[in-house]
Design a protein with these regions (language model features):
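Sequence-structural signature of mature extracellular/luminal beta-sheet repeat domains
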Residues: 1-352
Length: 352
């Protein structure tokens, strides 16, 4: 895709919210092959946009414990570090600058959600191989877990395993579009209402009959998820094994993070892939007299009110994930091709 300006509109107090919470919003857009970094310029009180070319960017995760920003592109898992304040010759000072530190070549295993423990253990979903993986120094990836309905590791995207979250520093909950065990089974007719949330530790399904569940996140002792096929954000009642719908958003939901008492949610225009033709979200939006949107929503998890939103304009149509970087302002991600990286030197402190 040719270069393009980032164009968006937002509600009146979106900038105030972003400034008050002093955070960066890092969003992956795989249809434009970019990651967008949104923050507030303290001088102008306007939103600063920075876009970084990342080929088919999907899962993205920020760990406050390690200060790693981890994201996927086609064939790689990238680990970036925040190196603090740097000046840009054209755009001035950026307080937070993420530069490349490591890369793991995995091949195109269709990385979806990515997580990191507080001790630096990295886990990710390979939708292609229907499993939870870890980076490997000796292979494309190291399998960590696969669903009990999948009988072997095969590059067949059988059930479209997509989402994952950690609890107590280990992978605990995953989301899957169905429980099929054949090549592309999730794409077959009748599978879109058979999504599940699975507890890896307890080895059981904790919620089923979901329409394309996505983005499980453990926050404030609740398991939050999004049902992309219906447009509902909510949580799983683990005692009743049911999905509690909390708020409807006119978008194809994917991408969720939290800060304070807010859920920060991303969504895309409804999918036109034949595999998603049975989903209700498009009709639900139409029946409500709404327009489908691609953007970011700020939702209060105490009241379930949507308090702020930012909508992207063309050509941004699809987002996958979002990471909230706290205690940060006016940030950017430097591209591997950025020549300034050749003259940035950081000496690790000797612990002795």
């Amino acid at each position: 895709m040719e270069d393009f300006p980032i164009s968006h509109s937002h509600t009146r107090h979106f900038t105030t919210w972003l400034s008050d919470h002093r955070c960066l919003l890092v969003v992956s857009s795989y249809n434009t092959h970019h990651i967008f970094t949104l923050s507030v310029d303290p001088k102008t009180f306007e939103i600063t946009n920075w876009k970084t070319h990342v080929n088919r960017s999907m899962g993205i995760h920020y760990s406050p414990a390690t200060q790693n920003l981890i994201f996927s592109n086609v064939g790689n898992l990238m680990i970036y570090k925040d190196k603090g304040e740097l000046d840009h010759p054209q755009f001035g000072k950026f307080e937070n600058n993420f530069i490349p530190q490591f890369a793991y070549f995995s091949g195109d295993v269709d990385v979806h959600d990515v997580c990191e423990s507080s001790t630096g253990e990295i886990y990710y979903i390979s939708a292609l191989f229907s499993c939870v993986c870890q980076p490997s120094k000796n292979g494309s990836f190291k399998p960590y877990w696969r669903p009990p309905w999948i009988d072997k590791y095969a590059a067949e995207d059988r059930c479209h395993l997509n989402g994952m979250c950690l609890v107590d520093d280990v992978p605990r909950y995953v989301t899957s579009t169905c429980t099929g065990n054949s090549m592309g089974a999730w794409r077959h007719s009748g599978q879109q209402g058979k999504g599940v949330v699975y507890d890896i530790v307890e080895n059981k399904i904790v919620c089923d009959n979901l329409k394309n569940p996505h983005s499980p996140r453990w926050y404030r002792d609740k398991l939050w998820i999004m049902e992309s096929g219906t447009g509902y954000f909510g949580y799983v009642d683990l005692e009743k094994c049911s999905f509690v719908k909390c708020a409807f958003l006119p978008t194809f939901l994917r991408g969720l993070d939290f800060i304070d008492n807010y859920a920060v949610i991303t969504g895309s225009h409804p999918r036109h892939d034949p595999a998603f033709k049975e989903l209700l979200i498009g009709k639900e939006i139409e029946d409500r007299g709404l327009d489908p949107m691609c953007g970011i929503w700020i939702l209060n998890i105490d009241t379930y009110d949507i308090e702020h939103q930012l909508m992207f304009n063309e050509p941004v149509k699809e987002l996958y994930d979002i990471a909230v970087v706290p205690n940060a302002n006016r940030g950017r991600i430097l591209e591997l091709s950025d020549q300034s990286l050749l003259n940035l030197f950081y000496i690790e402190k000797n612990k002795n």
